């Protein structure tokens, strides 16, 4: 069976992601605002060109659009940057969760993955609590939704490895970003955060396209 997520789109995504990662150490706003979302735009174009059903296509595009909005918001220098960024990515995760639940098939064996993920996220959240201030509630809500997204990714009935790997990369990216943003503030960490983020978005998009082109 041929899947309609095209190789040219994948290569353009890879090229633009590498360009951004390589340039990240020496570019600043507004260049970051322009370059950062381009790989996600490539994924949106790729999804538009697929043969997915209208409902699956709309949900996946919405997940990517809100991710793109979050990418842009987090590069803009204004006071509500973090709050709006969290809101955008929270909505993106909700659309991903909806897609996962539409193809839900409970697998008891995958429950063994939940405990280490839960402990890891719990430890990260506990570590950050003293540093969050007014963002405590939004960040904790976001963490809960992120964890639900990861857990539900493990229960899709097909393409489970690709989709769950994408969800785990998203978790790693978000936790690294949060720890660095609120505690460590090391500039070099941005490259790792964006690398894992781009890998996550590609795996989630590619996996979901394959899943729903197989009939969900």
Curated annotation (Swiss-Prot):
pH dependence: Optimum pH is 6.5-7.0.
Matches recorded under InterPro entries: TMEM86B-like
Activity control, per UniProt: Competitively inhibited by lysophosphatidic acid.
GO BP, one annotated term: lipid metabolic process
Record EC number: 3.3.2.2
Superkingdom assignment: Bacteria
Location in or out of the cell: Cell inner membrane
Principal subcellular localization: membrane
Any one Gene Ontology molecular-function term assigned to this protein's record: hydrolase activity
Primary enzyme class: hydrolase
Organism encoding this protein: Legionella pneumophila subsp. pneumophila (strain Philadelphia 1 / ATCC 33152 / DSM 7513)
TM regions (residue ranges): 9-29, 32-52, 58-78, 84-104, 109-129, 131-151, 163-183, 189-209
Family classification: Belongs to the TMEM86 family.
Membrane topology: Multi-pass membrane protein
Function as written in the Swiss-Prot or TrEMBL entry: Specifically hydrolyzes the vinyl ether bond of lysoplasmenylcholine (pLPC) and lysoplasmenylethanolamine (pLPE) to release a fatty aldehyde and glycerophospho-choline or glycerophospho-ethanolamine. Has no activity on diradyl plasmalogen, 1-alkenyl-glycerol, and monoacylglycerophospho-ethanolamine or monoacylglycerophospho-choline. May serve to protect the bacterium from lysis by lysoplasmalogen derived from plasmalogens of the host.
Alphabetically ordered keywords of this record: Cell inner membrane, Cell membrane, Hydrolase, Lipid metabolism, Membrane, Transmembrane, Transmembrane helix
Gene Ontology cellular-component annotations: plasma membrane
Protein name: Lysoplasmalogenase
Catalysed reaction, written as an equation: a 1-O-(1Z-alkenyl)-sn-glycero-3-phosphocholine + H2O = a 2,3-saturated aldehyde + sn-glycerol 3-phosphocholine; a 1-O-(1Z-alkenyl)-sn-glycero-3-phosphoethanolamine + H2O = a 2,3-saturated aldehyde + sn-glycero-3-phosphoethanolamine
